């Protein structure tokens, strides 16, 4: 753990690993916290494997956090949102973001790979979200080594630019 001069945690080295039925769940990360807040920058390796899916994320993540939220309250809001229909969840999430009650993952630079429902994926790139947590820009190379540049409007509508490479 890292502590500031006031004795408050400011980040640290986090690691965990456990066997689960048909696989494992593990991660290790180097985290840096916002003042009196949870992590907002972390370098990480995360892996999950069970009988249905497997995946690995390696990269750098940046989270935009309000100055005054409480982690327990934020977790409770996310838990409540998961139980709502999509439209209601999206409205509550947007309202909570606007009111500074929850955080937003803004940037991921790294590699995501695995298999879900029999489909393989391996996307390495830069993934940027807007301040409301919606996709804004994705610049990545996919499983078949095909480069992608995807741009989204504020409502999340995709405007896709595909790079045509000579064969």
What are these regions (language model features)?
Residues 1-167:
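Parallel beta-helix/beta-solenoid repeats that form elongated, surface-exposed shafts/blades used
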């Amino acid at each position: 753990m890292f502590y500031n001069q006031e004795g408050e945690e400011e980040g640290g080295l986090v690691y965990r690993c456990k066997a689960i039925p048909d696989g494992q769940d593990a991660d290790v990360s180097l985290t840096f916290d916002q003042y009196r807040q949870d992590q907002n920058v972390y370098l990480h390796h995360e892996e999950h494997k069970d009988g249905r899916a497997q995946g690995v994320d390696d990269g750098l993540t940046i989270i935009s956090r309000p100055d005054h939220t409480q982690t327990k309250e934020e977790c409770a809001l996310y838990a409540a949102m998961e139980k709502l229909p999509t439209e209601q969840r999206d409205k509550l999430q947007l309202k909570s973001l606007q009111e500074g009650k929850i955080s937003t993952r803004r940037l991921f630079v790294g590699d995501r790979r695995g298999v879900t429902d029999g489909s393989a994926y391996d996307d390495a790139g830069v993934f940027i979200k807007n301040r409301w947590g919606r996709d804004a820009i994705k610049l990545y190379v996919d499983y078949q080594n095909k480069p992608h540049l995807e741009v989204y409007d504020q409502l999340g509508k995709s405007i896709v630019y595909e790079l045509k490479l000579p064969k």
